């Protein structure tokens, strides 16, 4: 019940500015556009129960620009690695499904777009060791920041790099992942 209340509060607090931003964008004549991309990276895992201390990351993201500054983004990603706990081989995989609110900044250099983001979603964790497997899921929270560097004549493709901190509590243990990612993103629509 506590998680549902927190999720509802999060949606209300971040939903109101997003709706207001959309109405302002409609009045000013700017239209919403999309963005899609992928990234790869490395996660530093802070957990005693996962059996690993780092993991490889791969993910895809898709977003909708409410206006020039605000964006709603969906993220689907997976981190996995193998490690040893007391001589037993352990394979750990974490799959994430997140919804992020992104605030973009637009300095004078138009090809550079730094951003900060915060998100909430679901973490599914599975651990396989010595023929035995266990899985759990939990609510996950994420904050981060990074930049997009647009290139090419039309400036619709960008290199994206970011740093994020993700927290979940699967297997009754709080885990923090610090992830550095790099990837490519494309603008969709007439922005």
Regions found by a protein language model. Give the residues of each.
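Outer-membrane beta-barrel biogenesis signature
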Residues: 5-38, 189-191
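Gram-negative (and chloroplast) outer-membrane scaffold detector with strong preference
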Residues: 21-25, 42, 56, 63-130, ...
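N-terminal targeting signals for Sec/Tat export/insertion, comprising classic cleavable signal peptides
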Residues: 31-61
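Outer-membrane beta-barrel "beta-signal"
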Residues: 35-37, 101-102, 176-191
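A short, flexible beta-alpha/helix-coil linker loop
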Residues: 43-45, 123, 166-168
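Solvent-exposed loop/turn segments connecting transmembrane beta-strands
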Residues: 46-53, 86-91, 131, 169-177
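A generic hydrophobic-segment detector
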Residues: 129-182
């Amino acid at each position: 019940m506590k998680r549902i209340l927190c999720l509802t509060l999060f949606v209300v607090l971040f939903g109101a500015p997003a709706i207001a931003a959309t109405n302002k964008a409609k009045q000013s004549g700017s239209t919403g556009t999309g963005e899609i991309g992928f990234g790869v990276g490395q996660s530093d895992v802070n957990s005693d129960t996962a059996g690993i201390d780092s993991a490889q990351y791969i993910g895809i993201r898709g977003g909708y620009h409410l206006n020039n500054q605000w964006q709603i983004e969906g993220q689907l990603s997976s981190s996995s690695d193998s490690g040893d706990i007391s001589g037993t081989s352990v394979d750990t995989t974490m799959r994430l499904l997140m919804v992020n609110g992104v605030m973009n900044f637009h300095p004078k250099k138009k090809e550079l777009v730094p951003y900060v983001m915060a998100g909430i979603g679901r973490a599914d964790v599975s651990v396989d060791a010595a023929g035995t497997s266990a899985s759990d899921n939990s609510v996950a929270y994420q904050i981060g920041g990074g930049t997009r560097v647009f290139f090419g004549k039309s400036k619709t493709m960008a290199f994206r790099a970011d740093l994020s901190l993700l927290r979940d509590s699967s297997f009754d243990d709080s885990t923090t992942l610090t992830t550095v990612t790099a990837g490519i993103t494309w603008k969709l629509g007439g922005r």
